[in-house]
């Protein structure tokens, strides 16, 4: 994602503002548009790590993410001349719907430029909110360039997804809500892409209680902000590789970089495996649908938890399609040792399949799928057949036990996954 650059003087101008007052103003702007999301205590994570873990479910918002806060605050602060000309944004995700919804509420014309790769579901959702959607280019950068071109041509106000002071002040209202409900919170875990969400929350929280730790979380394949802070200057990643597309940003914003560098206490990294497991836990334990970027803070709890600590995780959004959910659930089940697939060679004689089935049943392995192929063998002249079995298991220790029992009965097991 390219970033609309701010001049150095602009960054310093915004850094010197009264952040608390501007975020309180944003709260006032938003009061008739959205309700504060509640803090939900996670009994699962609290028991798992012997601390108090709370979730802040921004996936409960209209349009399914926190983005409405910043977009609406930006539009609410526009002058009448700007509003009359309309607004424009570029996005393939939550920002598009946040801007479209906010513009509809304020009665302002909105144009959203989306790349060709945008799922039809998101295109239609954005159109349903009254926005004029333009499909352009093969990647986000192409859509961004087109949006800037149209902004200059027609005088539209560009609503940046993160590197805008009014936008991040809107996101900062989340921080106010947390402190109103849990004033003795120790740490707040926040996903980082371009940095708008964490910047806003950091400004809000640190202006009221500087002792609260603000912790950023990034996927291992999208570490632009972490690398930039560590190197002391804005860095651009050559490539991105993460399932958490909502935080897949090659370069942080100029303003968000300065705020993060000054106010964020630490940035931790999580793996793709961590993220997939967190999606599964969100569904199974929290009974809550959250997108991959949304659960990134949950994936980092084990890295920050300690006895008695009060931790809040920002669940930034819940816009995820059912096909993706299905795939991630399966990967999460495999990762947590809930499913195992293995192959075993059997002598091609009666009773061998039954013996395997009995051993699995005796060890509480529920067979999900079984393929018994007499024409499939490692050595075609060995007079053996290959059996492939997928079983439901109860964790990695259960898998180890099953493999051990089969091997004790002279079966050679090859793990597939």
Regions found by a protein language model. Give the residues of each.
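PLP-dependent amino-acid enzyme catalytic core
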Residues: 3-417
């Amino acid at each position: 994602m390219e970033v609309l650059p701010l001049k150095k003087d602009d960054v310093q101008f915004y850094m010197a503002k009264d952040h608390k007052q501007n975020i309180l103003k944003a709260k006032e702007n938003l009061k008739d548009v959205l309700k504060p999301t509640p803090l939900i205590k996670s009994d699962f994570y609290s028991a798992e790590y012997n601390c108090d873990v709370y979730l802040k479910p921004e996936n409960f918002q209209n349009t399914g993410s926190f983005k409405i806060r910043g977009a609406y605050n930006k539009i609410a602060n526009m002058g009448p001349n700007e509003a009359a000309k309309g607004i424009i944004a570029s996005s393939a995700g939550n920002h598009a719907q946040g801007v479209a919804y906010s513009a509809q509420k304020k009665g302002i014309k909105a144009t959203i430029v989306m790349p060709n790769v945008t799922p039809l579901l998101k295109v239609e959702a954005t159109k349903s909110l009254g926005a004029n959607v333009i499909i352009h280019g093969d990647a986000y950068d192409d859509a961004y360039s087109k949006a800037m071109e149209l902004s200059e041509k027609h005088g539209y106000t560009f609503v940046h997804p993160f590197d805008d002071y009014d936008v991040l002040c809107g996101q900062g209202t989340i921080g106010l809500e947390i402190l109103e409900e849990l004033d003795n919170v120790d740490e707040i875990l926040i996903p980082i892409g371009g940095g708008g969400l964490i910047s806003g929350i950091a400004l809000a929280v640190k202006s009221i209680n500087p002792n609260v730790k603000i912790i950023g979380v990034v996927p291992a394949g999208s570490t632009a902000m972490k690398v930039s802070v560590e190197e002391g200057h804005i860095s651009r990643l050559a490539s991105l590789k993460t399932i958490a597309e909502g935080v897949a940003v090659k370069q942080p914003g100029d303003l968000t970089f300065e705020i993060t560098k000054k106010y964020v206490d630490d940035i931790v990294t999580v793996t793709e495996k961590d993220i997939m497991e967190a999606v599964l836990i969100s569904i199974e334990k929290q009974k809550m649908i959250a997108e991959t970027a949304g659960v990134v803070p949950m994936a980092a709890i084990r890295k920050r938890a300690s006895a008695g600590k009060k931790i809040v995780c920002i669940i930034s959004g819940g816009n995820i399609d059912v096909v993706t959910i299905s795939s991630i659930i399966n990967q999460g089940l495999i990762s947590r040792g809930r499913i195992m697939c293995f192959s075993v060679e059997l002598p091609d004689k009666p009773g061998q399949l039954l013996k395997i089935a009995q051993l699995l049943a005796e060890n509480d392995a529920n067979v999900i799928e079984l393929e018994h192929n007499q024409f499939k063998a490692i050595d075609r002249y060995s007079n053996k057949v290959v059996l492939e079995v997928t079983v439901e298991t109860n964790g990695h220790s259960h898998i180890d036990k099953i493999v051990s029992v089969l091997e004790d009965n002279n079966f050679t097991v090859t793990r597939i996954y």
